[in-house]
């Protein structure tokens, strides 16, 4: 989801039978690299494959499905804890054995940038001259740290963080599957807190859904758990700035501290609001276009706030 720059060419290669012996999946943490590597293993070893659409019914697909028992021919290695020369030699030796029951013997190496220089050199020969039945999938957040002689043998697919519209679609499908009502104002908070990482964002949503009440997941329930500044407090701060009410602004900061809020978080959220107003001045339909993460029912309020300032005023306040 949201990784078309990877899925489109990779699907075409699988369907055409253009299989390489080493792949490199890179990108920020939590963006789906390792999960995609597992899906690719299913695609490669499906009885009807290699295919971009594994059947999900054959023994290989069932064993590699989420919650499945696993497959002897697909090995996952966490290079953060198994990165030494002996670990790589063992992996290299195993690579020369033919698959027990599948088309390919696949090695998924997570955190591949953590492999030690001596370990990488031990692995190099089998990556350079692999048996026909072996495929390596390296996953890493720092591809530049993988030695060039290995990196040059791979097909490199860069993953990226999800955009807010794509993330909202993912959250809405998850919520629909759970059957829990979630207020529209909750989504922007969860999306921002997740930082574009599907894994982190879904983890936050799962935590919030676990504590949902009879009315579902409301803004008032989610906001304190996420540590986000209340929108009404930000609205008051914007009104104070627009009216150039300096005493009122100092009184508001005192209120933030006395109420137990994090002053640093208040400052960050206020800067984010000023940034949103600057975008709305430049692009009136920014909320609908997904440039500003806010519920659609807040569009008129934010637009009115943006109109109370000139462009230079917002720039000055944000600086």
Model-derived segments and spans:
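P-loop/Walker A NTP-binding region and its immediately flanking N-terminal helices
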Residues: 1-156, 174
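Extended, largely alpha-helical regulatory/partner-binding modules appended to the mid-to-C-terminal parts
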Residues: 59, 63-70, 87-90, 103, ...
């Amino acid at each position: 989801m949201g990784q078309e720059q990877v899925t489109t060419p990779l699907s075409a290669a699988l369907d055409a039978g253009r299989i390489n012996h080493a792949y490199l999946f890179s990108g920020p943490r939590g963006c789906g690299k390792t999960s995609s590597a597992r899906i690719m293993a299913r695609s490669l070893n499906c009885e009807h494959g290699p295919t971009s659409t594994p059947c999900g019914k054959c023994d290989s697909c069932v064993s590699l499905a989420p919650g499945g028992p696993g497959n002897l021919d697909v090995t996952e290695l966490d290079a953060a804890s198994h990165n030494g020369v002996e670990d790589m030699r063992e992996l290299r030796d195993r690579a020369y054995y033919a698959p027990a029951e599948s088309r390919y013997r696949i090695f998924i190496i997570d955190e591949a940038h953590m492999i030690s220089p001596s370990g990488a050199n031990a692995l190099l020969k089998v990556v350079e001259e692999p048996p026909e039945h072996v495929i390596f999938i390296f996953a890493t957040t720092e591809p530049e740290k993988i030695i060039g002689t290995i990196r040059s043998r791979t097909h490199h697919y860069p993953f990226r963080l999800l955009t807010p519209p794509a993330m909202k679609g993912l959250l809405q499908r998850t919520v629909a599957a759970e059957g829990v009502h979630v207020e529209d104002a909750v989504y922007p908070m969860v999306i921002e807190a997740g930082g574009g990482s599907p894994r982190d964002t879904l983890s936050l949503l799962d935590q919030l859904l676990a504590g949902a009440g009879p009315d579902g997941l409301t803004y008032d329930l989610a906001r304190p758990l996420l540590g986000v500044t209340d929108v009404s407090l930000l609205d008051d701060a914007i009104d104070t700035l627009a009216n150039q009410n300096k005493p009122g602004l100092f009184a508001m900061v005192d209120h933030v501290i006395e109420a137990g809020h994090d002053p640093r978080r208040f400052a960050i959220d206020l800067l984010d609001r000023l940034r949103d107003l600057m975008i709305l001045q430049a692009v009136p339909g920014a909320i609908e276009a997904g440039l500003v993460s806010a519920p659609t029912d807040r569009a008129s309020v934010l637009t009115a706030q943006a109109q109370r300032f000139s462009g230079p005023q917002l720039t000055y306040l944000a600086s």
